[in-house]
């Protein structure tokens, strides 16, 4: 008997495929049955080798050894997933396996994960590709019935390979170069550093902003409505107008214009717009939203989340009304639901995957069992579908121009004619939406008629600086980066991809370059002193959002077969070579790069400073360190962050709430810090009541 080997990206997805295919016999690392073997990767099983694999001299960091630009790339099996790779290699090379199906995630990274395992295992068998946008059983069956030769995805693989190797070369060379120049570890990334630079630039704009006061005279009409004068920079001028207006009994209508306007429904979600709304409405980080969406996808409740499209293909038009009606019934919005399918259909704007949708499985699911975060994301996606196919929001706007005391005043009024899609949005998301103050209706007046003035007052305001970046605004900036410098006919891709932007933000936070400040719904992202210092010493080509956006656009062209991979890689290598040969240390920069002192070493009394991987004693022979990736805290379900480190160094103890036991139970405890005889840190637990 011969088998087809199916390789998924993770165990849970492999189990879902196995169930549909009838491979019900569970083995060590795979499922078997009905002519199928179904196994899985666990993320990236195969990774790019570190520099020292190419040459032992690279163990030591030296500018003289740069640039490091491999001619023949080498890969290693990840140590943590070596067993699973061994299982896959054995399955791939079994004599009774006659073909392999790549069933990893249908995107750039999923393609790379499979191809690297396939090549590292030395497999030569025919490969077909499974391409899914939904994990529903009928979608899985349809996908396996329409497998394509993997060669159709060679361009996608080439783009993934170029992205991985470019990131490696920029990260390895730039990090070593600047670390050596400034005598301390500095992490530099192709995408990470330009994003950090954007936040530093925004904070510089805010710091340089000088607010200017302005003054406005406001008239209240007896028949309803208010009118505003122009802005005055001098208070005395506004006060003079106010005095004159108070002497007048009325204002003369110079112009009255009434227009009917409409606001079209919003487009369906792609991942980035979902992440932006989830941050704005729910306070979720981009990574939290991606995690919740991925879980919903694997539970078959939404379609593939890592999409950059906001439209659907023509073949989906027939089933969409039923999906919308079913979704409306679940979320209490079925009343007066009108489905305009063509508003969301545009196959020409669909790339690898169509826009995010809830699936038909939502109607059969026990939604009460969903975690709160997942339910909130599902509600956003459902609401967006119903709004996107709904009626326009229609209103009548009246604009009055009046004259009082020789000065022009403007008033706007608004009357809603049809709530349209906004009524659905309020039904499904009403508790999340901020209540905006709508313009009141204005009296029905004619030109040259007189409006009695009920009152007049002076209002003071001031110009506002740019807003601090939160995740919503930063994601938007990443998405549109470089657009102004590109030709009009070039498709904008921005910095990163929908699948990687969240990870970029998290990496900047974890490495201490950005910090989140504020409460959950109003958290902003601020560059730390360390982040500002890094950007200060980085040359333009490393921190330029425009250059990074241009690279992303070229990766997209490679993916579409419009550009040769070698051309892109040559450009990256030339940039790195130029960087290494022309960059010198910035004078006075070392003062900016000082390590932050957070406390006193309990072992020797020297300063403890923060570095990338932990808090280290500055005294050379002392071995005291608090690792950020600390195993003791991991076992408690906690992370050793700067607040905890500060408490431990100051008080020798820190109280933690909701620690997790091995059995999943939660408890409160106090962590005590002491030192081993050789100076290394040692932790113990103290429980309430001395237990």
Regions found by a protein language model. Name each.
Residues 104, 276, 306:
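Short glycine-centered, acidic/aromatic-flanked micro-motifs in structured strand/loop junctions
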Residues 73, 95, 137-221, 258-259:
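C-terminal or mid-to-C-terminal helical accessory/interaction module adjacent to the motor/catalytic core
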Residues 11-18, 35-38, 42, 78-89, ...:
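Amphipathic alpha-helical transducer elements in NTP-driven molecular machines
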Residues 235-269, 275:
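Metal- or metallocofactor-binding catalytic centers and their adjacent structured scaffolds
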Residues 1-164, 168, 438, 465:
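Intrinsically disordered, low-complexity regulatory segments
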Residues 2-5, 81, 92, 120, ...:
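Basic, low-complexity terminal or inter-domain segments flanking catalytic cores
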């Amino acid at each position: 008997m011969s088998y087809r080997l199916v390789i998924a990206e993770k165990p849970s997805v492999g189990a879902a495929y196995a169930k549909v295919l009838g491979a019900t016999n569970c083995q060590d690392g795979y499922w078997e049955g009905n002519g199928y073997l179904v196994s899985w990767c666990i993320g990236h099983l195969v990774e790019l080798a570190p520099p020292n694999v190419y040459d032992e001299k690279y163990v030591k960091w030296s500018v003289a050894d740069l640039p490091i630009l491999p001619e023949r790339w080498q890969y290693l099996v990840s140590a943590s997933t070596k067993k699973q790779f061994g299982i896959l290699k054995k399955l791939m090379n079994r004599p009774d396996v006659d073909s392999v199906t790549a069933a990893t995630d249908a995107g750039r990274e999923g393609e790379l994960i499979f191809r690297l395992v396939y090549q590292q295992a030395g497999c030569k068998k025919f490969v077909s590709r499974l391409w899914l946008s939904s994990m529903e059983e009928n979608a899985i069956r349809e996908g396996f019935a329409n497998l394509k030769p993997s060669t159709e995805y060679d361009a996608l693989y080439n783009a993934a390979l170029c992205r991985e190797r470019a990131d490696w070369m920029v990260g390895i060379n730039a990090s070593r170069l600047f670390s050596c120049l400034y005598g301390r570890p500095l992490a530099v990334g192709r995408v990470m550093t330009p994003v950090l630079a954007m936040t530093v630039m925004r904070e510089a704009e805010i710091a340089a902003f000088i607010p200017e006061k302005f003054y406005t005279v406001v008239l209240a009409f007896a028949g309803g409505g208010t009118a505003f004068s122009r802005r005055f920079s001098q208070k005395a001028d506004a006060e003079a107008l106010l005095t004159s207006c108070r002497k007048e009994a009325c204002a003369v209508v110079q112009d009255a214009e009434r227009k009917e306007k409409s606001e079209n429904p919003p487009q369906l979600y792609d991942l980035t717009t979902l992440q932006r709304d989830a941050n704005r409405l729910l306070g979720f980080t981009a990574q939290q939203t991606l995690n919740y969406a991925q879980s919903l996808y694997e539970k078959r409740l939404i379609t593939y989340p890592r999409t950059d499209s906001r439209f659907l293909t023509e073949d989906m038009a027939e089933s969409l009304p039923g999906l919308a009606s079913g979704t409306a019934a679940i979320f209490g919005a079925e009343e007066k639901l009108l489905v305009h399918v063509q508003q969301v259909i545009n196959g020409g704007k669909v790339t690898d995957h169509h826009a995010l949708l809830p699936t038909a499985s939502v109607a059969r699911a026990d939604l009460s069992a969903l975690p709160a975060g997942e339910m909130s994301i599902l509600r956003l996606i459902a609401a967006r579908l119903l709004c996107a196919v709904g009626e326009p929001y229609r209103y009548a706007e009246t604009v009055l121009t009046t004259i009082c005391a020789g000065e022009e005043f403007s008033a706007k009024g608004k009357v809603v004619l049809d709530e349209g899609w906004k009524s659905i949005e309020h039904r499904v998301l009403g508790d999340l939406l901020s209540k905006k103050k709508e313009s009141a209706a204005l009296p029905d007046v004619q030109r040259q008629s007189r409006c009695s003035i009920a009152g007049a007052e002076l209002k003071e305001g001031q110009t506002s600086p740019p807003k601090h970046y939160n995740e919503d605004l930063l994601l938007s900036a990443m998405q549109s980066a470089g657009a102004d410098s590109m030709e009009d006919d070039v498709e904008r891709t921005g910095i990163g991809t929908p699948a990687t932007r969240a990870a970029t933000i998290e990496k900047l936070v974890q490495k201490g370059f950005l910090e989140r400040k504020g409460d959950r719904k109003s958290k902003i992202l601020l560059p730390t002193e360390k982040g500002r210092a890094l950007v200060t010493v980085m040359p333009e080509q490393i921190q330029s959002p425009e250059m990074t956006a241009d690279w992303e656009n070229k990766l997209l062209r490679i993916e579409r077969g419009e550009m040769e991979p070698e051309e892109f890689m040559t450009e990256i290598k030339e940039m790195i070579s130029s960087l290494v040969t022309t960059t010198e240390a910035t004078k006075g920069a070392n003062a900016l790069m000082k390590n932050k002192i957070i406390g006193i070493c309990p072992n020797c009394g020297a300063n403890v400073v923060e570095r990338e991987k932990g808090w280290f004693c500055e005294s050379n022979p002392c071995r005291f360190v608090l690792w950020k990736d600390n195993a003791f805290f991991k076992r408690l379900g906690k992370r050793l962050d700067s607040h905890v480190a500060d408490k431990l160094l100051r008080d020798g103890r820190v109280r933690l709430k909701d620690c997790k036991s091995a059995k999943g139970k939660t408890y409160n405890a106090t962590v005590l810090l002491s030192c081993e005889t050789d100076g290394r840190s040692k932790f113990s637990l103290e429980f309430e009541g001395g237990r």
